[in-house]
C-alpha cells in the first residue's frame, strides 16, 4: 500500500467587511468536498483559511459604525465561522490575516525580497483628502464624468456612459469619504519587481499547475510584459506597517495570501506533530493547492508564486480555479431575491441540499455555475430522496420486522454488486480531478441500477407470498449493502447523511476502502428518515427573505456574485443597463501602430490606432503602467470607436482604449484573442 499523501489546501480568504453569500459558498463547498475525499481515502489533508481583515474599506466601515477595526473584524469572523460550520465546511483552522503570525511572515517575506533587490521605491502622485488626511483610492473619489457630464461618478469610470478615465480627469472631484475637494500630493511608494520573475513564471504556469484555460489567460499577461506591483499604502490604513518605514503599510493584497501561511503556522503552533517547513520549505515534498475564483487569478498565478520564489519558499502544486455563480440563469440580484446570504439559506433549507446540487454541477473547468432553483428542487428530490434514500427506506422495514434487524449473509445480486465495486476507481478519479459532476453522475447511475433491481425483485410482493421470506431477506440485505456503497461514494459531499446512515447501519465511520466489503450477519439499528424532500414553498420563502435582507440597506445593482474574495468584493459592479444602452457603444479591435510619450503630460500616451480602413489618434492615461510605450507597438487592443472626438490640451482624442486595474502601475491594457483583426466589431 502506498504511503498517505501530505496535502495542504486553502480557499480564498473571505473579506471581513460583509456577509458570506451563496456565490462565496460555492468555493468553500467545492474545496471542502475535495478535502473530505482525500481524508476519506486515508491521506493527510489539512484545510486552512482565514478572514482577509485589512484595508481601507474595513477601516472606514468601522469608523462609520463607531467601533474599532479590530472589533469589526472580530464580529465578522464570528459570523463567517458560524456560516461555514453550518454549511459543514470543516476547516482544520480558520484564522485572520490580522494576526501576529501574519505580521511576522509578511515582514520576513518583504525583507527577503528587499535584500535580494526585488523591491523598488519611487514617488507617485495621488489625490489626497485634506480633511481626513489620507490618500484616496479611485473608488473614494467622486465627481462629474469628463465624457458625458453625469454627476456623482467614481474616480475611474462612469456608470452612465461607461467611460474609463484617470481620477485627475474628473470635473469637480470630491472625496467620497468627507466631501472635501481633494488635492494632488506626492508620496513615496514601494514596488515589487514582478518582471524579475518573468522567466520563472512562464515555465511554472505551463507546468501543469493551472487549468489550460487559465494558463492561456496568464500567457496573455506574460506576453504583454509584466509591470512592477505597488505593494504599499499610506497611513491612515488598517494593516501592517512596513518594517523600517513609518507611516507606510503593506497593501492588503500583499499580506492576504501570506495569510494562508499564517493560518497554517497558527495551527502548527497548537499541533506539535505538524512541521511548518515540511509544507512551506523550499524543498517540501508535500502537496499545496489553492482553490480560488477566476476573478483573482492574477494575484495567485503571478504575484504569489513570484513572492514565494523570491523569499525562498516553495510554490503551489496547483491552483484550482472556478467560475462565478448565477441564479436562474442571471446575475445574482437583490431585487429578484436571488442575492442570497448563507445565513438566509440556512434559515430555510438544509445545507446538504446545496452541497449536492453544487457537486452535481461542478466540473473541473472555469465555467460559471447556474443555481436554477426549480432544477435544484427537482434534482435533490429525485436523486437524493427518490433514489439513494429510497433504497434504504424501501427495504429496512422488511429486515426489522422479518428478521429483527439482522442482515443475512446472502448476496442476491453478485453481478450488480461487482458493478458497484468496479465503478469505484472511476468515481475516485473524478473526485481527484475535481470533476464532482462526473462523480455524482456515475454514483446516481449506480443508484438507478439498484432501484431497478429492487423494483424487479419487488420484496413487497414477495413478502405476501408463502415461503418467500428467505428471498425477501436476501433481496433486502443486498439492497442495504448497495445503499451502503452509495453512502461511501457520497460521503465527501453529504457528511450528515453519511453519519445518519452509519448510525442506521450500526457501523464505525465509513472510509473509502470499506466499499470493498459487505455487511453480513450484521445487526442494524432502527431506520429513521434520512432526508426529506425540498418543499418549493421554503425556496420561495428564502427568496422573499433575501429581498427583505438586502433591499432595506442596499440599492439593487443586479450584482454578479464572485465566488471568492476578489476585486468585485472591494469594487462592486455598476447598476445594470438595458441592451439598447449597451448596443449604442461601438467596440472595435484596434492595432497600435505607434505609442509615444506626450510632451508635457504626466499620465498620457498618444496612441495611433489602426481600425481597418482608417487610423485614429487616441490619448490614454496609461503612461504609469507602460513607461516604455514602444513595447505597445504592434499590439492588438480594444477601443470604443464611436465616442465623440474630444479636444484636449495636446490634441484631439478620437476614441478610448479599454484597460483594467485600479490605476497607477496597475493598469492592464485589454487585448483580444489571437486571430482578431483590426476593425472587427466586438460583440
Curated annotation (Swiss-Prot):
Is required not only for elongation of protein synthesis but also for the initiation of all mRNA translation through initiator tRNA(fMet) aminoacylation. A motif ('HIGH' region) lies at residues 14-24. It comes from Pseudomonas fluorescens (strain Pf0-1). Its EC number is 6.1.1.10. This is Methionine--tRNA ligase. Belongs to the class-I aminoacyl-tRNA synthetase family. MetG type 1 subfamily. Zn(2+) binds at residues 145, 148, 158, 161. InterPro entries: aa-tRNA-synth_I_CS, Anticodon_Met, Met-tRNA-synth_bsu_C, Met-tRNA_ligase_1, Met-tRNA_synth, Methionyl/Leucyl_tRNA_Synth, MetRS_core, MetRS_Zn.
